[in-house]
């Protein structure tokens, strides 16, 4: 809870691209905000901002709130380690957040950041807000509102359970997939994979459930044995990226039956 005379921030999970993913709690939170902050990521990713605008147009009923758009800097990848690159990027964004809060939000105002999916899963908004808070230049309290993740949307579109009965689930990146699947994990969800690491899975029984642009009108899903569908996924992914200018995908790898025989 925010103290009297203190700014308040709402970090709102908005789902994975379908405005109907918005929960009642998220809609109510939108309508508590005086200022709605919408990130933009360049001409190639205008749809990400457009979904947020659509959500505000659909669900914000108060007349006195306003939207403020801000550009998200591109993460530098050359000449720096991955961890260093991410840290520098987060520092840049923290500076932007700090400026937004001090310039756009009154001392007792409430601002909302609309976060793709759920803020707890492979998103850095909470970390960045904590960084701003630690700097101490702007005093505020914040709450987090959960949302539907791309992982939930993936399982729903493929009509599969996330886990095998009584078995654990691993959530990892493409860079680290080789460390676990299929030897140590029967179910691995890959959230970030610029290398399409699934094509290096050699187990003939491994299944893949892949999805891109989940929840949006451009959603694509493919499933099957990795050996049988990997080339189709690679081709489909490349074509979609060329058409859209960006790609946002996720997949689940499985070793074992989804349903009992």
From Swiss-Prot:
Gene Ontology terms for molecular function: precorrin-6A synthase (deacetylating) activity
GO annotation (BP), single: methylation
S-adenosyl-L-methionine as UniProt keyword: yes
UniProt key word Transferase: yes
Catalytic reactions of this protein: precorrin-5 + S-adenosyl-L-methionine + H2O = precorrin-6A + acetate + S-adenosyl-L-homocysteine + 2 H(+)
Record-listed E.C. numbers: 2.1.1.152
Name of the featured protein: Precorrin-6A synthase [deacetylating]
Protein's pathway: Cofactor biosynthesis; adenosylcobalamin biosynthesis; cob(II)yrinate a,c-diamide from precorrin-2 (aerobic route): step 5/10
UniProt keyword list: Cobalamin biosynthesis, Methyltransferase, S-adenosyl-L-methionine, Transferase
């Amino acid at each position: 809870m925010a103290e009297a005379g203190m700014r308040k921030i709402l970090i709102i999970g908005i789902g994975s691209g379908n405005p109907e993913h918005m929960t009642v709690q998220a809609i109510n939170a939108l309508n508590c905000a005086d200022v709605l902050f919408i990130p933009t990521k360049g001409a190639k990713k205008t749809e990400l901002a457009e979904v947020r605008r659509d959500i505000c147009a659909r669900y914000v009923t108060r007349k006195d709130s306003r939207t403020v758009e801000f550009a998200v800097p591109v993460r530098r990848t050359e000449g720096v380690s991955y961890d260093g690159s991410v840290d520098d990027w987060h520092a840049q964004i923290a500076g932007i957040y700090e400026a937004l809060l001090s310039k756009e939000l009154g001392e007792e105002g409430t601002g909302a950041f609309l976060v793709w999916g759920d803020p707890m899963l492979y998103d850095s908004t909470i970390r960045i807000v904590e960084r701003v808070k630690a700097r101490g230049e702007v005093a505020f309290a914040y709450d987090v509102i959960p949302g539907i993740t791309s992982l939930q949307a993936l399982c729903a579109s493929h009509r599969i359970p996330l886990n095998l009965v009584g078995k654990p689930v691993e959530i990892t990146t493409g860079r680290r997939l080789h460390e676990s699947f299929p030897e140590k994990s029967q179910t691995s969800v890959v959230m970030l994979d610029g290398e399409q690491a699934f094509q290096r899975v050699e187990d003939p029984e491994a299944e893949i459930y892949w999805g891109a642009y989940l929840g949006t009108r451009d959603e694509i899903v493919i499933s099957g044995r990795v050996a049988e569908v990997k080339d189709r996924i690679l081709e489909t992914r490349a074509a979609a990226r060329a058409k859209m200018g960006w790609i946002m995908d996720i997949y689940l790898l499985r070793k074992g039956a989804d349903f009992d025989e």
